[in-house]
Structure formats: structure tokens, C-alpha cells
Curated annotation (Swiss-Prot):
Species per Swiss-Prot/TrEMBL record: Neovison vison
CC per GO annotation: cell surface; cytosol; dendrite; endoplasmic reticulum; Golgi apparatus; inclusion body; membrane raft; nuclear membrane
Positions that bind Cu(2+) 4: H88, G90, G91
Protein name: Major prion protein
Glycosylation sites: N185, N201
Length: 257
């Protein structure tokens, strides 16, 4: 009878300890979905206001407000504003005042053994990119852009766009939107610079399509990394010292009894 009571108390203590550790473990916040409320992607953390995608009140192809291909605002190829490749404004590639010009000075990454272990499983840490990792190759997503010309252009030129993305561990971000925002910016920037160095230039249509493609790939990468992060956390909880010792003690009592 005494052994039975001891075994029962040990079982209760084991379950309570395991549950307490599980609830206390840090997890990244999913953010409640794509672009829903609060300080969300796009445009988050943009000191120059011109990160992907361009900001403004207008939608795709509108004549005012910062949409794609507009004559005024922050769209692609504009003579004024902060879009890609503009002769005026503070947000273009390589310009001193824009947000993209700051990529040349990545912040010094902090050493974290958990991140290094995660990198070994997910991808190699890329040197010179502030601790970013390069994900595994993906099949380029099937995307419809709303018109036949862009759909056909994407099918014919998809090989020109990246099939891997750069990212940091998910536990460095508060939600999915922040992860995707950072992932899109660094991946597009790195691919554009590398390709331009080889003598190949991108058109306005290329840039629009590439960002949509990379965005979808970054969402997929976040989902993969989140799942792997939770699995690693569950394994660490299960095999941490207190639960293991209690479980072994309980099994010994049950066998002896």
C-alpha cells in the first residue's frame, strides 16, 4: 500500500514538473496571421520608409499613392520618390540615405550555441551577412499575378529568380511578419547585387515578380523553421534531468512493487 501511494505521488510530481517546464519554455509568437493588425510587415523597421514593398495609399498600378509603376510616390522606376533604381529620393539601392544602403554594414551577430546547433540542421551560416543562414533549395511557387502578361513573364523567366532564401532563427523574431519582412529584404538585395555583378540587370517587372516569389518562399521557410524549433524544444523538455529522473524512479518503483 505504501509503495502504491509513493508511486502515485511520484507520477503526479512528474506530470506537474514536465508541464511547468513546457509552459515556461520560450516560443516564437506566430503573430496571428499574415499582415493582420498592429505593427506588421510590410514596412516594419524601415528607417527610410522605402523597404519592400513600397508604401503609400495606392494599390497595384494606381496613378497616385506609391503603387507599382506610378508617376508619383514611391513606386518602381519613378523619377521622384524612394523606389527601386530612382535618380532622386532617399530609398534606392546604393544611396546613402535609404534603408537598402545600410545592408553594407550588418550588425555583429551574437554567439549563441542554440542557434549554431539549429543552423547545422537547417542550413549553413552565411559569412559576411550578419549571421543569416541560407535555406535549402525550393521549387519556385506557382503564383498568379492578376494579368496574363505577368503570369507568362514569370513562367518564362522564373529561372532568373532565387530558389533559396536568407533568414535568421525564428526565435529572434516576435512573429511571422517580422521574419518574412527581414527574409524578403535580405534575399532580394543579395540576389540583385549578385546578379547585377554578373552583368545581368533586372527590369521593373522582374523586381515586382521576384519580391512576390521570395515572399512566398520566406513564408514557407518560416513554417519549416517553426516546426523544427518546436520539435527541438519538445525533445529538450522530455529528456531534461528532472523529468527523466522522476520517470526512472517511477518505473523502478512499479517494477519492484
Amino acid at each position: 500500500m505504501v509503495k502504491s501511494h509513493i508511486g502515485s505521488w511520484l507520477l503526479v510530481l512528474f506530470v506537474a514538473t514536465w508541464s511547468d517546464i513546457g509552459f515556461c519554455k520560450k516560443r516564437p509568437k506566430p503573430g496571428g496571421g499574415w499582415n493582420t493588425g498592429g505593427s506588421r510587415y510590410p514596412g516594419q523597421g524601415s528607417p527610410g520608409g522605402n523597404r519592400y514593398p513600397p508604401q503609400g495609399g495606392g494599390g497595384w498600378g494606381q496613378p497616385h499613392g506609391g503603387g507599382w509603376g506610378q508617376p508619383h510616390g514611391g513606386g518602381w522606376g519613378q523619377p521622384h520618390g524612394g523606389g527601386w533604381g530612382q535618380p532622386h529620393g532617399g530609398g534606392g539601392w546604393g544611396q546613402g540615405g535609404g534603408s537598402h544602403g545600410q545592408w553594407g554594414k550588418p550588425s555583429k551577430p551574437k554567439t549563441n550555441m542554440k542557434h549554431v546547433a539549429g543552423a547545422a540542421a537547417a542550413g549553413a551560416v552565411v559569412g559576411g551577412l550578419g549571421g543569416y543562414m541560407l535555406g535549402s533549395a525550393m521549387s519556385r511557387p506557382l503564383i498568379h499575378f492578376g494579368n496574363d502578361y505577368e503570369d507568362r513573364y514569370y513562367r518564362e523567366n522564373m529561372y532568373r529568380y532565387p530558389n533559396q532564401v536568407y533568414y535568421k532563427p525564428v526565435d529572434q523574431y516576435s512573429n511571422q511578419n517580422n521574419f518574412v519582412h527581414d527574409c524578403v529584404n535580405i534575399t532580394v538585395k543579395q540576389h540583385t547585387v549578385t546578379t547585377t555583378t554578373k552583368g545581368e540587370n533586372f527590369t521593373e517587372t522582374d523586381m515586382k515578380i521576384m519580391e512576390r516569389v521570395v515572399e512566398q518562399m520566406c513564408v514557407t521557410q518560416y513554417q519549416r523553421e517553426s516546426e523544427a524549433y518546436y520539435q527541438r524544444g519538445a525533445s529538450a523538455i522530455l529528456f531534461s534531468p528532472p523529468p527523466v529522473i522522476l520517470l526512472i524512479s517511477l518505473l523502478i518503483l512499479l517494477i519492484v512493487g
